[in-house]
Amino acid sequence: MTLNDRHRGKLFSIGMKMAEVPDADHRLLGVIRRLGLNFGFGEKTVGEVCEEAGVNPHTLLLISKIYAYDGYVPSAEELSRSSMRDILTYLHNSHDFYIDIALEALDKAIHAMMNTCDEKHYKILMRFYGGYRDEILKHFEYEEKTVFPYVRAIDGGKTTEGYGIEQYEENHSDVDEKLNDLKNIVMKYLPQDCDNNLIQKLSLIHI
């Protein structure tokens, strides 16, 4: 997203007030929680809050920039200063969030929409949504059981065989394609009397 005028040109920093971080992008409230940081930080800085929680502050800044700056690509230096342990914690907690909250909300939106759709459109949507949901859950399981242990091993200086990160990239692209297919079905083919708010809910889901 484009930063608002207050944050245009303003860099995230360890010395800034933690309460100011979500001003750049409201989604950073979720980032803060999924890194294991509790609210109620008052006037404390990013560095102070992270130190108290045992979280690498550079990791928070890195993820915040990815959310707040369009097309942001972190430098090698930024990546080296961040904690892989904290990044994996964030990703694991994100899985819990999507399964327990985001997908549950999407389930309810899908079924609420069915009340106004005919049988033909019901079958079309459910086929694509069912495929997307299954793909997401399989993807999360794949990350938890295969990708995260691989990354932990590499981060710990261990060598691994039989798996490469390029395999992860291919798997992740399949998930994105499923979501795009579902969005296209909703936008192009569902009648106007169906719930138009569904596409907005779909737009909030990004893995």
Q: Where would I find each of the regions flagged by the language model?
A:
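Small-residue-biased structural context
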Residues: M1-I205
